[in-house]
From Swiss-Prot:
Segments of this protein annotated with the region Disordered: 44-770
Signal peptide annotation: 1-27
Residues bearing the modification Phosphoserine: 120, 518, 544, 614
Sequence segments annotated as region (10 X tandem repeats, acidic): 199-470
Region (4 X approximate tandem repeats) location: 471-585
GO cellular component, one term: sarcoplasmic reticulum lumen
Region feature (Metal-binding): 780-826
Protein name (Swiss-Prot/TrEMBL): Sarcoplasmic reticulum histidine-rich calcium-binding protein
Record's comment on post-translational modification: The N-terminus is blocked.
Sorted UniProt keywords: Calcium, Phosphoprotein, Pyrrolidone carboxylic acid, Repeat, Sarcoplasmic reticulum, Signal
UniProt feature, compositional bias: Acidic residues: 184-195, 208-217, 233-246, 261-275, 291-303, 319-332, 348-360, 376-388, 404-416, 432-444, 459-468, 484-497, 722-733, 758-769
Length: 852
């Protein structure tokens, strides 16, 4: 043992010189001559016969006597493996970490004593840990060596044992510069030619298995550890280090990762269930493995380190993935943004129905950017299903284009207030160009806004029936759908309640078709004074299409205000307006002037069957500019109907309701009359003159009726208010079973000088139930009596001396005591309360005095 140190030192020098100077062929021959067994002492490390074998062993003693520079040369050039416990230089670390990057830390930092622990056991544990991730498949042939050669990799071990020793010098010489960052693509070929050092060590290790003795000294064990480090460093094919490597390997792992990612043309290495520490080691060797291995290295579930690479390529994959974004139906919000990038193109080419189903709100914004193009090309039905409210705003942007292509009337139904402004801008174009159907089914409120955004385009194309299904209008919604009754279609099926105001908001624009009465839907949008663009189209000269968006504030309009406002206020107050509820839509068919008016409960439904005059109960009030030109006969016809409606009007339940009903009486008359003004008739200019003549007459009559109705309703309203007050009082009394205190204003005051008995009789417990003023002592007769005792109120006695009784006031003392008792003792409904009631009667009898 004493001489082994210098001997190993000498052998180490020779080995280093030989590896550096001799050609690869000579070195291979020397290696193959049997020097390997002693060189690769595995666990026991039997003493080798030759000096070179001992030098290859790289004993700790040799290192202890070597300078760092010599160690670097010998170790790095000869074996390319650095035992970190003996190396103090960062360059050594760089060589090792960059070159093989998978030295177990356990061996890097082992002291000689630490190395005495069973190397084979550590190797086995470490080997098993590395096999766990699933890399053991590379070298099942070497599984038998795991116990002894714990750090040997599995891959290609058995195949290359013959060539290991001969290839080793060449490999080492090339590996040394590579450790410093010289790993380049050109060296991949060299790596492929070279058998991984692991295999070289395996070859020697197997020869050493026969020579291993159990009597290995500590120095042998240190050598074994030393070579184990080298074996494990050279373990390129095996991903055995992916097992339980510590976090210090992370840094080395990432050094090689650059090469790995550059050369990874195949699948990203999906590493199985390796932990984060495994990922970093696994990726150290992955560069080499992937450089040599262009086939798929399918390692199950890729860990987080793979994800970063995977995402690098994902961008390209997503850029090429143009097909998946086509499903606009139930796409989630994250998909919407990409999906809609391509949607514009698809929608531009889509001349058929673009059935957009339940697109979410985020889809709507992008989807509708391109929708303009789609709708310009979309000559067929644009069946837009359940699109939400957010689409409305963008839809109107493109409506102009769609409406410019349409040539016929576009009957717009229920447009929201915000849509009124835009809708009217494009409505002129839409009404000029409307040719085809825009079949919009059961669009909800949110659908109305979108549907009608695009309806401009659809309705402009709408010569046929625009079968707008049931438009569901929510009362008091400012944004009610643009369910415009398009192209003179009957929205017969549209039983839209409360749509009257909305449906008619936009319909006022030249829905006057030659053969039919114009479907003028006059919309009272709350607080909207936007009046129509009287569009009279060429031969279909319709009545002025005015969109009367007037405030239906019926409760606040006084009779005087109605008269001053002309017919505008009256129309706003049309019988359809109950309080703030908008009346249902009025839809008139082209061939039939019948109105299908489904009204809010309490509203009068008028189905006027005039083919010439669609007897719509026009919501808007007609100022002279707003009034159409219906024939006089139609004016009178509606006038009669108005009178019929006004007659049965009954006063509202209270205050605001009364006001709305009163106004309804006058406004219904005017509304229907005004509605008739806006119905385009088959007669053109001749009838317009007739309409003009009838307007002045109607105005006068309407004003008269309005004044009369206001006068009639005023007394009724007042009477009704009184009745309601009385009813409320009765209800309050009914709710309080122990109501006592009478109302002093009720007029039931006892006459002056009345006896206590009389007052007691007047204010018995039964009588006290009538009163709603509750105080303590609900049944207490004292309280009742005292509150009603006029004698006490007029008593001239000295209040300070209540003990005295005056002749005029006989009950002062009684009334004085009563409140004290009630406040202190008497609880409503309690025993004392009942007792006090009985006591009251007794006292009343005792104090009873005959009247003077």
């Amino acid at each position: 043992m004493g001489c082994r140190g210098p001997w190993l030192h000498t052998c180490l020098l020779w080995a280093a010189v030989a590896s550096l100077l001799l050609p690869p062929a000579v070195t291979q021959q020397l290696r193959g001559a049997g020097l390997g067994p002693s060189t690769w002492i595995n666990n026991a490390g039997a003493p080798g016969p030759s000096g070179e074998a001992a030098a290859a062993g790289l004993g700790h003693h040799g290192h202890s006597h070597r300078s760092p520079g010599e160690e670097n040369e010998d170790v790095s050039m000869e074996n390319g493996h650095h035992f970190w416990s003996h190396r103090d230089h960062g360059e050594t670390d760089d060589e090792v970490s960059r070159e093989y990057g998978h030295q177990p830390q356990g061996h890097r930092y082992h002291s000689p004593e630490a190395g005495d622990e069973s190397v084979s056991e550590e190797g086995v544990h470490r080997e098993q840990a590395r096999q766990a991730p699933g890399h053991g498949g590379h070298g099942e042939a070497g599984a038998e060596d795991l116990a002894e050669h714990g750090s040997h990799g599995h891959g290609h071990e058995e195949e290359d044992e013959d060539v290991i020793s001969s290839e080793r010098p060449r490999h080492v010489l090339r590996r040394a510069p590579r450790g410093h960052g010289g790993e380049e693509e050109g060296e991949e070929e060299e790596e492929e030619e070279e058998v991984s050092p692991e295999h070289r060590h395996r070859g020697h290790g197997k020869e050493d298995e026969e020579d291993e003795d159990d009597d290995s000294t500590e120095s042998d064990r240190h050598q074994a550890h030393r070579h184990r480090g080298h074996r494990e460093e050279e373990d390129e094919d095996d991903d055995d280090d992916e097992g339980d490597s510590t976090e210090s390997d992370h840094h080395q792992a990432h050094r090689h990762r650059g090469h790995e990612e550059e050369e990874d043309e195949e699948d990203d290495d999906d590493e199985g269930d390796s932990t984060e520490s495994d990922r970093h080691q696994a990726h150290r060797h992955r560069g080499h493995r992937e450089e040599e291995d262009e086939d798929d290295d399918d390692e199950g579930d890729s860990t987080e380190s793979d994800r970063h690479q995977a995402h690098r390529h994902r961008g390209h994959r997503e850029e090429e993935d143009d097909d998946d974004d086509d499903d606009e139906g139930d796409s989630t919000e994250s998909d919407r943004h990409q999906a809609h990038r391509h949607r514009g193109h698809r929608e531009e080419e889509d001349e058929d129905d673009d059935d957009e189903g339940d697109s979410t709100e985020s889809d709507r914004h992008q989807a509708h950017r391109h929708r303009g193009h789609r709708e310009e090309e979309d000559e067929d039905d644009d069946d837009e299903g359940d699109s939400t409210e957010s689409d409305r705003h963008q839809a109107h942007r493109h409506r102009g284009h769609r409406e410019e292509e349409d040539e016929d009337d576009d009957d717009e139904g229920d447009s929201t207030e915000s849509d009124h402004h835009q809708a009217h801008r494009h409505r002129g174009h839409r009404e000029e160009e409307d040719e085809e159907d825009d079949d919009e089914g059961d669009s909800t409120e949110s659908d109305r806004h979108q549907a009608h955004r695009h309806r401009g385009h659809g309705e402009e194309e709408d010569e046929d029936d625009d079968d707008e299904g049931e438009h569901h209008h929510v009362p008091h919604r400012g944004h009610r759908g643009h369910e415009e009754d398009d192209g003179g279609d009957d929205d017969d099926g549209d039983d839209s309640t409360e749509n009257g105001h909305q449906a008619h908001r936009h319909q006022g624009h030249g829905k006057e078709e030659a053969e039919v009465t114009s479907d003028e839907h006059h919309h009272h949008v709350p607080d909207h004074g936007h009046q129509g663009h009287g569009d009279k189209e060429g031969e279909e000269e319709g009545v002025s299409t005015d969109h009367w968006h007037q405030v239906p504030r019926h409760a606040h309009h006084g009779p005087g205000g109605e008269e001053e406002g002309g017919e505008e206020e009256l129309t706003v107050k049309a019988g359809h307006h109950v309080a703030s509820h908008p009346p249902p839509g009025h839809r008139s068919r082209e061939g039939h002037a019948e109105e299908h008016q489904t009204e809010v409960p309490g509203h009068h439904q008028h189905r006027m069957g005039d083919t010439d005059t669609s007897a719509e109960r026009g919501h808007p009030a007609s100022s002279p500019r707003q009034q159409g030109h219906p024939p006089e006969d139609t004016v009178h016809h509606h006038r009669g109907s108005l009178k019929e409606e006004v007659g049965p009007e009954s006063p509202g339940p209270a205050g605001v309701k009364d006001g709305s009903r009163v106004k309804r009486g006058g406004s219904e008359e005017e509304e229907e009359q005004k509605g008739t003004h806006h119905h385009s008739l088959e007669d053109e200019e001749d009838e317009e003159e007739g309409h003009g003549r009838s307007l002045s007459q109607e105005d006068q009559e309407e004003e008269d009726r309005r004044g009369e109705s206001a006068k009639v309703q005023a007394p009724l309203r007042h009477h009704r208010e009184e009745e309601e007050e009385e009813e409320e009082e009765e209800e309050e009394e009914g709710r309080l079973p122990f109501t006592i205190i009478p109302n002093p204003l009720s007029g039931r005051e006892a006459a002056g000088g009345a006896s206590s008995e009389e007052s007691a009789e007047d204010t018995g417990p039964e009588d006290t139930q009538e009163y709603g003023n509750y105080q303590q002592g609900s049944l207490c007769g004292y309280c009742t009596f005292c509150n009603r005792c006029t004698e006490c109120e007029h008593c001239h006695c000295d209040e300070d001396s209540m003990g005295e009784h005056c002749d005029q006031c006989q009950h002062c003392q009684f009334c004085y005591l009563c409140p004290l008792v009630c406040e202190t003792v008497c609880t409503p409904g309690s025993y004392v309360d009942y007792f006090s009631s009985s006591l009251y009667k007794a006292l009343a009898d005792m104090l009873e005095t005959p009247e003077p």
